[in-house]
Curated annotation (Swiss-Prot):
A UniProt-annotated Pfam family: TMEM254
Gene Ontology CC: one annotated term: membrane
InterPro entries: TMEM254
Protein name listed in UniProt: Transmembrane protein 254
Source species, domain of life: Eukaryota
Keyword tRNA processing: no
Keyword annotations: Membrane, Transmembrane, Transmembrane helix
Membrane topology: Multi-pass membrane protein
Locations listed in the record: Membrane
Transmembrane domains' residue ranges: 16-36, 62-82, 96-116
């Protein structure tokens, strides 16, 4: 969290709020994709019947969107590496942290990297 050893190692954790929302959403979506028969649809309020409807009438689309979401996260992660290099974040471990965090949490992570403004070195 915050800065460590200057711009070359800048890293900021994503907001706990967004991390929680994304984990719960992707967790539920993964459950729907891989184990739909084990979901207690009646206990989920309006989300249960809606999920059943989507699986029954749009099964292929639900699966396609799931894999598309993961592919988008891969793309965002690769972009995070490019951004790290362009913003002077050269520490390999820090770049890996940005890659992993962006892969797991997408724009909730990438936002902090996009917003980061490195200090410019004075030319002498």
């Amino acid at each position: 969290m915050g800065k460590a050893r200057g711009d070359e190692a800048y890293f900021q954790r994503s907001s706990l709020f967004w991390v929680t929302i994304i984990i719960l959403s992707f967790g539920y979506y993964t459950w729907v994709i891989f184990w739909p028969e084990s979901i207690p649809y009646q206990s989920l309020g309006p989300l249960g019947p809606f999920t059943q409807y989507l699986l029954k009438h749009h099964h292929t689309l639900v699966h396609a969107w799931y894999w598309l979401a993961w592919m988008i996260h891969v793309g965002e992660s690769l972009y995070a590496i490019v951004l790290c290099k362009s913003k002077g974040i050269t520490n390999t471990w820090t770049q890996l942290l940005w890659f992993l965090q962006t892969f797991l949490f997408g724009l909730a992570s990438l936002y902090y990297l996009i917003a980061f403004r490195p200090k410019h070195q004075k030319q002498t």
